[in-house]
Amino acid sequence: MATVLFVKANNRPAEQAVSVKLYEAFLANYKEAHPNDTVVELDLYKEELPYVGVDMINGTFKAGKGFDLTEEEAKAVAVADKYLNQFLEADKVVFGFPLWNLTIPAVLHTYIDYLNRAGKTFKYTPEGPVGLIGDKKIALLNARGGVYSEGPAAEVEMAVKYVASMMGFFGATNMETVVIEGHNQFPDKAEEIIAAGLEEAAKVASKF
């Protein structure tokens, strides 16, 4: 029995957002295939996620060194710790997010900022940083209206690349990715594209 954390980074309704359809399909199929697992859903748009700033930066540094924190620093660190600990305690983590303006929604970026903690998700060594979450399974679920997997747009795609890079930096070696793309670029094939993506999500979820 495993604990799986589902992180949702889109508050648009499913009928308006393919990434939400993808997230919901993966979630439903995962629950069906793994009835004994503990599923925790985290909707980032329903959380209070202050941007990382001086109090959180100084506070996490001082906490790591065992120094006393100011009241403001302690509050900021407590927010980050809440999400970091939840992430660390999960055996598997699923991220559902769209490509917006070539990158990820700001709430997801802020959430990942909270996870980026020396001594927790990575450590410094003389040879460079080393990730610490290697045994955690990660799934990335992304939808984008255009085609970014190939062609001239491929090099400017900074959503899946960013999240995958951060998880890799944290040491993740077991990552699954499901992407639905091109449904806006090719509207005559949109239904077919989306259906194929949801079918792929179901397959990946059943084995994840």
Curated annotation (Swiss-Prot):
Quinone reductase that provides resistance to thiol-specific stress caused by electrophilic quinones. This is FMN-dependent NADH:quinone oxidoreductase 4. Keywords: Flavoprotein, FMN, NAD, Oxidoreductase. Belongs to the azoreductase type 1 family. InterPro entries: Flavodoxin_fold, Flavoprotein-like_sf, FMN-dep_NADH:Q_OxRdtase_AzoR1, NADH:quinone_OxRdtase_FMN_depd. It comes from Bacillus cereus (strain ATCC 10987 / NRS 248). The keyword Oxidoreductase applies. The gene is azoR4. Binds 1 FMN per subunit. Pfam families: Flavodoxin_2 (PF02525). It is an enzyme of class 1 (oxidoreductase). Its EC number is 1.6.5.-, 1.7.1.17. It catalyses: 2 a quinone + NADH + H(+) = 2 a 1,4-benzosemiquinone + NAD(+); N,N-dimethyl-1,4-phenylenediamine + anthranilate + 2 NAD(+) = 2-(4-dimethylaminophenyl)diazenylbenzoate + 2 NADH + 2 H(+). SUPFAM superfamilies: Flavoproteins. One of its GO terms (molecular function) is electron transfer activity. Its cofactor is FMN. Homodimer. Transmembrane segments: none annotated.
